Design a protein with these regions (language model features):
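Short amphipathic beta-strand/extended segments with alternating polar/hydrophobic composition
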Residues: 102, 115-121, 198-204, 399-403
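Extended assembly-interface regions of large multimeric machines
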Residues: 1-194
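Extracellular ectodomain segments of secreted/surface proteins
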Residues: 50-58, 75, 130-161, 273-323, ...
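Short, low-complexity Pro/Thr/Gly
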Residues: 150-348, 353-354
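C-terminal domain/tail detector
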Residues: 329-569
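Mixed-charge (acidic/basic) macromolecular-recognition segments
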Residues: 1-22, 27, 203-251, 257, ...
Length: 569
């Protein structure tokens, strides 16, 4: 490996020497390859020194950057989990008022060794049910949702917060198209009960992804794009504002309709019924942090065991040693993570997890050994460690169908039924580690310049494109450069905001839509890229994105002010 690095550095130096010889012909006699032995030795020594520096960076920087990302955005270091949308529903006679189920509630399927899914966002459950959903009128410009208040609940107490979240649960291309159509063409949301009618809102709004603020301290909006590539389904929800006005309809109301008016006819391919829409939903992932015991089972073989009833250690994605005695973890687990043995003067310890296809007894084998100049040295059998294991059931979870995740755990909400209303997506290991993490960090440091060059933006998108890296079917190409991005042009501009002149950027992306599942897919991609650009700008700066599609269509997004260091006042 060092020989390859040295050869590369030497080639670069010879290339620079040749360029200098062209500019300074009087030096050409000594700058040519092998033209002068003394110069050749000098270049070899410089190349050797550079190669040593580069090898040191390759060896040490990934560990350092990993620790830095723990503070910047820990979510990017986590595995890509299997994900679904779970719908919660109250039993008809038990819930009298709107109730918020906090993130962390868990659900499972009925298998002998089940997959456990944890909610990643709070979910507000109201004591009403969606009884019907349909498109009204020959022009298909009105969507009507029929709600029934359950049991002894009264409408004023059932309302809860001011926003009703509507999940779009049809086939993904259709759901993305419906999302785009509602966001662009909804002109009013009305509530109708008998002869009484009230206007709740003048539009439908997108539901932002809720992220754990403790995991993200950097403003650059990278994680939403990672989520988009891996599971666009989590964005298929819209919000109907103005819900608290429903209380004015009165406590005696048992049935009401929510009507969404459109200024353009809904395409016939988009189906509206109770199978393509759902209330009271939240994303849930097959990913859990589990306390485990590390028990010796041979000179080099150890077993991870857990006593937590809701989780089994199935596919290990990450292992972090806790209280390891004489060992200290300098980095989170990766396939070649290095630990240090303090008693032996800092000698490296190789820590390797062997992924097991079996889920019997909730165990998985791994190897832990001391590495010296002669190879691995076994640790004593009396070595006992504790670990925190990030585990997922990705291999099994991706085979679950709609409705399979419907069984309770010790952390499931009581007096409610639940089921997954969308298919379960695939899961995979962490996207970033080693050189990939170093490259991502480098592009973050570049900021806006890394986002306004076609090659650089394409590479950043490819780094976030987990399905392409994992080789999943129907992934957007590819893992090295984002192929659908065909061109990029930019133009500086300015606008007046109050009494301030704000500089900005008009950015146009030429996009090949063949790799996108639908027009709504393209629309969502542009929204997230626009947010990414804004997150690299200061609050007094702005960006406006335009997508140029192959069929000549243009999608123009609203001007966004920068969110770097906080939102614009």
């Amino acid at each position: 490996m060092f020989h390859d690095i040295y050869g590369h550095e030497l080639d670069v130096l010879h290339k620079l020497a040749a360029e200098l010889a062209e500019r300074c012909p009087e030096l050409a006699s000594i700058l040519g390859r092998d033209a002068d032995p003394a110069m050749a030795r000098l270049l070899q020594r410089v190349a050797f020194a550079f190669a040593r520096v580069r090898q040191r960076i390759d060896d040490d920087v990934p560990e350092i950057i990993h620790a830095i990302f723990e503070d910047i955005d820990r979510a990017l270091l986590e595995p890509v989990p299997s994900t679904t949308l779970v719908e919660l529903a109250a039993h008809p006679k038990t819930l009298r008022a709107a109730t918020v189920i906090e993130a962390g509630a868990t659900f499972t399927d009925s298998a002998a060794h089940p997959c456990v899914f944890s909610m990643t966002e709070p979910c507000e459950v109201r004591p009403w049910a969606l009884r019907a959903a349909r498109v009204v009128g020959g022009e298909r410009r009105e969507i009507r949702l029929s709600l029934e208040v359950l049991g002894g609940a009264e409408l004023p107490r059932a309302v809860g917060s001011d926003t009703i979240i509507l999940a779009l649960t049809g086939a993904l291309p259709s759901a993305l198209d419906l999302r785009a159509w509602l966001l662009e063409h909804a002109t009013a949301v009305r509530a109708v009960s008998g002869t009484t009618e009230i206007v709740l809102a003048r539009n439908v709004v997108a539901v932002p992804r809720v992220r754990d603020s403790s995991k993200q301290r950097h403003s650059l909006a990278l994680a939403p794009l990672r989520d988009y590539f891996a599971c666009a389904r989590v964005f298929c929800r819209v919000a109907l504002p103005g819900a608290q006005q429903l209380a004015s309809l009165g406590a005696e109301v048992r049935r009401l309709d929510l009507v969404i008016e459109l200024d353009a006819s809904l395409p016939p391919a988009i189906v509206i019924d109770t199978t393509t829409l759902a209330l009271h939903t939240a994303p849930a992932v097959s990913l859990a942090s589990v306390e485990a015991r590390v028990e010796p089972a041979g000179p080099l073989r150890f077993v991870l065991r857990t006593d937590e009833p809701d989780h089994r250690i199935v596919d290990v994605m990450d292992v972090d040693l806790v209280d390891p005695g004489s060992l200290r973890a300098l980095t989170r687990w990766t396939p070649d993570a290095v630990l240090r043995d303090l008693d032996e003067g800092g000698g490296p310890i190789l820590f390797e997890v062997r992924r097991s296809p079996s889920v019997l007894e909730g165990e998985i084998d791994f190897e832990l050994s001391l590495l010296d100049d002669d190879g691995p040295v076994p640790l004593p059998l009396n070595t006992h460690l504790r670990a925190r294991v990030l585990t997922t059931s990705a291999a099994r979870a991706a085979g679950l169908a709609v409705g399979d995740i419907s069984h309770a755990t010790e952390r499931s909400p009581v007096a409610m039924t639940f089921r997954n209303v969308t298919p379960v997506t695939r899961g995979g290991p962490p996207l970033f580690g080693g050189d990939r993490l170093w490259e991502l960090f480098h592009r973050i440091k570049l900021g806006l310049p890394a986002l306004t060059e076609r090659e650089s933006l394409g590479r950043l998108l490819s780094l976030l494109n987990g399905p392409a890296r994992f080789g999943w079917p129907q992934a957007k190409p590819d893992a090295n450069a984002f192929a659908p991005l065909r061109g990029l042009t930019r133009r500086r501009g300015s606008t007046i905001a109050g009494d301030e002149v704000c500089p900005g950027l008009e950015l146009s992306l030429e996009l090949d839509t063949a790799s996108f599942s639908s027009h709504g897919d393209v629309q969502l991609f542009g929204e997230l890229v626009s947010a990414l650009l804004a997150s690299a700008l200061k609050p007094h700066e702005w960006v406006r994105l335009t997508l140029q599609l192959a069929n000549g269509e243009r999608i123009i997004y609203p001007r966004l002010f920068g969110t770097r260091g906080g939102a614009r006042p």
